[in-house]
From Swiss-Prot:
The lineage of its organism: Bacteria, Pseudomonadati, Pseudomonadota, Gammaproteobacteria, Pseudomonadales. PROSITE patterns: RIBOSOMAL_L16_1 (PS00586), RIBOSOMAL_L16_2 (PS00701). This is Large ribosomal subunit protein uL16. InterPro entries: Ribosomal_uL16, Ribosomal_uL16_bact-type, Ribosomal_uL16_CS, Ribosomal_uL16_dom, Ribosomal_uL16_sf. GO terms for molecular function: rRNA binding; structural constituent of ribosome; tRNA binding. It comes from Marinobacter nauticus (strain ATCC 700491 / DSM 11845 / VT8) (Marinobacter aquaeolei). It holds the Pfam family Ribosomal_L16. Part of the 50S ribosomal subunit. Belongs to the universal ribosomal protein uL16 family.
Length: 137
């Protein structure tokens, strides 16, 4: 599971997910990319599930880059616990996703296979996505 090795603070405030992705919004490493078109949170488990799905589809050919990292801790209180008595303990880690954010990149496979792999991976994610190709500058 992806999570930071160490953080400055154990727990963070909720915050608001607004705006568009200013960084990581282009295909930088691979030839094809999976880009988010809606906003939301992706957990470390979802990132890993999508990665496994893509890896299985492309078999041994090609390379995959994960362009998101879950760096925000989400806390929760146990069931049937009264309110108050402090913030709950960290349950899992998420990556805040904004529209336009590149989630995964891939190279070394045919476009058809890349599309299939990204479609399978997108089914595992809670945000809407689209397939993009690298633009030649």
């Amino acid at each position: 599971m992806l999570q930071p090795k160490r953080t400055k603070f154990r727990k963070v405030m909720k915050g608001r997910n607004t705006g568009l992705a200013q960084r990581a919004n282009k295909v930088s490493f691979g030839e094809y990319g999976l880009k988010a078109t809606s906003r939301g949170r992706i957990t470390a488990r979802q990132i890993e599930a999508a990665r496994r799905t893509m890896t299985r589809r492309i078999k041994r050919g090609g390379k995959i880059w994960i362009r998101v990292f879950p760096d925000k801790p989400i806390t929760g209180k146990p069931l049937e616990v009264r309110m108050g008595k402090g913030k709950g303990s960290v349950e899992y880690w998420v990556a805040e996703i904004q529209p336009g954010r590149m989630l995964y990149e891939m190279e070394g496979v045919a476009e058809e296979i890349a599309r299939e792999a990204f479609t399978l991976a997108a089914a595992k994610l809670p945000v809407q996505t689209t397939f993009v190709k690298r633009t030649v500058m």
